[in-house]
């Protein structure tokens, strides 16, 4: 049996490509895991489905890699995780001459990195790199993104961290398991 199967699902009329985890998490290294991945999957079965491509508002995120793996990473408390992703911004619904930022962070922990900027006048695409600090408390955490307006990256991160704007579950692009 393979370590993962790709399935196509119909959800509210939209086709999404998802990865179903079976015995191992995608291409993440589980040799250092403190318990079998199947136990994590039993505790939180939702971590078995992570979309390969996510469109959230005017931005599409794809090809997410966290910590030299795929969309799932095991980490020690406080460990720095590096990742990369591809993005595509459709500017047709953005305000012209407004500055927008793609921010990456961890649910309930806050925004941690800013990947790219867009002026709102042109479509853009590319790939970006990011760093995340794993939470200090062991657990299962969602990596999310927010595409928001702000004069600087610091202000865009503050929009998330202050609670004024928070990415929904639809903006989940990865999972970090802190052991």
Label each residue range with its predicted role.
Residues 2-12:
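Bacterial N-terminal signal peptides that target proteins for export
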Residues 29-77, 177-179:
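Short, compositionally biased P/S/T/A/G/V-rich stretches that sit at domain boundaries
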Residues 118-126, 135:
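Short proline/glycine- and polar residue-rich coil/turn motifs
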Residues 83-91:
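Aromatic/hydrophobic beta-strand junction motif of beta-rich domains
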Residues 151-179:
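Short beta-strand elements
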Residues 77-83:
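Structural beta-strand segments of beta-rich domains
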Residues 13-23:
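Bacterial N-terminal signal peptides
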Residues 131-139:
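Short, surface-exposed loop/turn segments at beta-strand-coil junctions that are enriched for proline
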